[in-house]
Every structure is written in structure tokens, then in C-alpha cells.
Amino acid sequence: MNKEEWLKKGYVTEPVDKTLDLKTEIDKLRKEKNALILGHYYQSGEIQDIADFVGDSLALAQWAAKTDADIIVMCGVHFMGETAKILCPDKKVLVPDLNAGCSLADSCPADEFAKFVKEHPDHTVISYVNTTAAVKAVTDVVVTSTNAKQIVESFPEDEKIIFGPDRNLGNYINSITGRNMSVSYTHLRAH
């Protein structure tokens, strides 16, 4: 199978020798390549068992930022790998399954979001961390669900704000802060 076929599938589907001890082989490569394996809470137990650290997307990004490993293997979705690369531009970041997507990030096409932002030049743009690097590139502040309220409240009450792409989180922050942020058209379909 050539590289293009692998990329099309998103992962390697070649049969693995049943006599191979995968954990031992992964540990060997981890040491040999100076790699850090990060696993999201949503991963299977087998993936979590071999990960150096298991956590949510924010915790994984924080681990990536402080590692001295040469390679970061992000067992999560695309935006998590992109976030690790933003924080660690000199490191090689690998996402084992190229089909691993996030419905929220996928529901916010960067070109459409950038157009929306351009149509509102007097607005501050706040984006939820679960979004692509391309959306983050047109964002002023990136927030998590834990700090979104605090960040929004740090702006003057009359500040015009676009909040995206999680409409549910944006609407909740509007309701508890009394703000009237422009909440983008996207939302989390299934998580």
C-alpha cells in the first residue's frame, strides 16, 4: 500500500503479526524515538493503558507543551493534534487515526467562520478550544468550558463578542453573565 492509500484510509490496516507483543514494541519505539503518547479520555482502555498521560483536551495540550520528547503521539482527534503542534512547533506531532474527527470542530468550516468574523470587524472573537487551528487563527481568545465565563466577564460589558463554535456553551455563558454575545451557527452534535 502506498502513502496516498494510507492517507485516504486515515490509518494503516495492514495485518499485524499475532505473535507480536504490541505493548513491548510500542514501548521500544517510544524509547527509541523519544516519543510521548497522550491519550484522550474517550480512547479505549487499550490506548489509555499504553499512554504516558490520559486526560481531557486541555490537559493533553498542557502535557504536550511541557514535554522534552521529540515526538508527540496524540491519541485523540485532529484539533488536539493541531493544538499540540501550535504549542510545540518544533516537535513532530502524530495523530494515529487521521479519520478521528470532532463533530464540533467539523461543524465550523474555517472559511465560513472567517467570513462571519470579517463581516463583524468591531467584535472580539472568542473560540472554544475544541476547534481547528484555522478557526483559532481568526480568534482573539481561546477558552475552555472551565474558564469561558471568567474570560467573557474580563471584557467590558459593552464589548461586542462573537463566541464560537459551541452554540450551547455560548448561550449558557450569555444566560449566566447577562451578555448578548453573537453565538455562531455551529453546535456540538454528539460528544
PLM region spans:
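Conserved small/polar residues in nucleotide/adenosyl-binding loops
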Residues: 186-191
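Donor nucleotide-activated moiety binding/catalytic core segment of transferases
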Residues: 143, 147-149
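Metallocofactor- and cofactor-centric catalytic cores in central/energy metabolism, strongly enriched
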Residues: 2-83, 87, 96-111, 115-126, ...
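Carbohydrate-active enzymes and regulators
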Residues: 91
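Internal active-site segments that recognize and position negatively charged phosphoryl groups
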Residues: 151-155, 159-175
